[in-house]
A protein has these predicted regions:
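C-terminal alpha-helical interaction appendages
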Residues: 1-65
Length: 65
């Protein structure tokens, strides 16, 4: 099931900054629409988030560059 809005994302993802949530949602939807399982969609979506954001203590912050 595709996510239409960030508010529909799992609770763990909703704790991310809005930009990271959008990256996760768009990536998850793309992988899922290509026939990927939920687990594969989530794994690839987290990888996409981690390319642009990093965890600093308890917070996620945008990577420089």
């Amino acid at each position: 099931m595709p996510y239409k809005r960030n508010a529909e994302l799992p609770a763990t993802v909703r704790k991310l900054p809005a930009g990271a949530q959008t990256i996760y949602r768009k990536t998850w939807n793309s992988v899922a629409s290509d026939g990927g399982s939920e687990a594969k969609s989530a794994s690839i979506a987290w990888s996409a988030v981690k390319k642009s954001y990093r965890k600093d203590g308890d917070r996620w912050v945008r990577r420089a560059g």
